[in-house]
Design a protein with these regions (language model features):
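Phosphate/ATP-binding catalytic cores across multiple sugar-kinase/actin-like superfamilies
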Residues: 37-44, 102-120, 164
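Acidic, glycine/GT-rich loop-and beta-edge segments that sit at the periphery of enzyme/chaperone cores
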Residues: 163-207
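Glycine-rich phosphate-binding loop plus the immediately following alpha-helix
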Residues: 70-109, 164
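Nucleotide/phosphate-binding catalytic cleft detector across ATP-hydrolyzing
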Residues: 1-54, 145-146, 194-207
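Repeat-based blade/solenoid architectures
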Residues: 155-160
């Protein structure tokens, strides 16, 4: 099961429904949309994710961007996630998604230029109802497609959730790969250090 809002109330509700359906705990799990995206993107050909991948989800007034990059840790590739949100973008409900994007493409493109000046990604994936259109405006398309592969679709999260479920019986992600999306870090990680002869804990990660 994949959900957009990883909130405890929603997770508890899903858990209660699943229990009433009499599924065992090992038969189901809940993952975030970002994690579904990571499963989907990193199950593709290596050339599509080698430098990193970006997801742009335009379902609401602002665009959510999720960027996944690999870091090597003790011989393992760790997929780390960074998330960013644009400012609210004016949207006219009387017009279709293409017409709205034509009006707002310069504002969105400038935001993406700032974001992608910090990251080198191999591919960009577009999803969300406000990106649902047959073609995309020229300025927006020229920028995104420059030295990058770009894909658009509305079933990305579903495909990613299916691939995530398959990991229990089949290798989906590349060998020696650890998925470390933010919702996967469920505990704090600390190590003891000594500073000026004083023992103290160093916090490495926290939920």
């Amino acid at each position: 099961i994949t959900i957009a809002d990883y909130e405890i109330k929603k997770l508890n509700f899903i858990s209660e429904v699943i229990k009433r359906l009499q599924f065992n705990s090992e038969q189901w799990s809940v993952i975030s949309h970002e994690e579904s995206f990571a499963f989907y993107a990193y199950s593709q050909k290596k050339g599509l994710y080698s430098a990193g991948v970006m997801l742009l989800d335009y379902s609401n007034d602002n665009i959510a961007s999720y960027i996944c990059m690999k870091s090597n840790l003790n011989g393992c590739d760790v997929i780390m996630e960074n998330r960013y949100f644009s400012d609210a973008i004016q949207y006219d409900e009387e017009k279709d998604s293409y017409s709205n994007l034509c009006v707002n493409q310069h504002e969105i493109t400038e935001w993406l230029k700032g974001l992608l000046s910090r990251y080198n990604v191999s591919s960009v994936f577009l999803t969300g109802s406000r990106f649902e259109m047959e073609k995309f405006p020229d300025e927006f398309t020229r920028f995104l497609c420059h030295s990058r592969k770009v894909f658009a679709g509305q079933n990305l999260y579903v495909k990613g959730a299916v691939l995530g479920a398959c990991t229990k019986i089949k290798q989906i992600l590349p060998p020696d790969t650890i998925l470390a999306c933010k919702n996967r870090i469920t505990t704090g990680i600390e190590m003891d250090i000594s500073e000026r002869a004083n023992d103290m804990p160093l916090k490495i990660a926290v939920s």
